[in-house]
């Protein structure tokens, strides 16, 4: 039963808009949007125990805290990499009955 609950919440993460909002905010150089999205992503990852993505999103949140996007590229790439790894693993989990 606990496994089913964990799986349910993990799969719901796939529909969370935070990563896309972060991507859009950075592309538009919208520091406020990027910060809010990074902060939300960080919190969701902390709550769900997604440690690797939490760590890099927390670092990115701090870089964006001043609402400036300059200097965020390298950390964003790390967030993107961890997000891809995590979402692929969740998709595999979701495919299992």
Can you say where each PLM-predicted feature lies in the sequence?
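Long amphipathic alpha-helical segments
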Residues: 57, 92-97
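Short, well-ordered alpha-helical segments
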Residues: 18, 30-37, 45-65
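Long, amphipathic alpha-helical coiled-coil segments characteristic
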Residues: 1-40, 71-94
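Conserved catalytic segment of histidine kinase HATPase_c domains, centered on the N-box/ATP-lid region
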Residues: 66-70
């Amino acid at each position: 039963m606990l496994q089913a609950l964990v799986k349910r919440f993990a799969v719901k993460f796939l529909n969370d808009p935070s990563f896309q909002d972060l991507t859009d905010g950075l592309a538009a150089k919208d520091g406020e949007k990027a910060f809010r999205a990074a902060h939300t992503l960080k919190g969701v990852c902390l709550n769900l125990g997604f440690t690797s993505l939490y760590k890099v999103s927390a670092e990115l949140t701090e870089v964006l805290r001043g609402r400036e996007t300059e200097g965020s590229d390298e950390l964003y790439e790390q967030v993107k990499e961890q997000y891809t790894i995590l979402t692929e693993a969740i998709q595999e989990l979701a495919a299992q009955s």
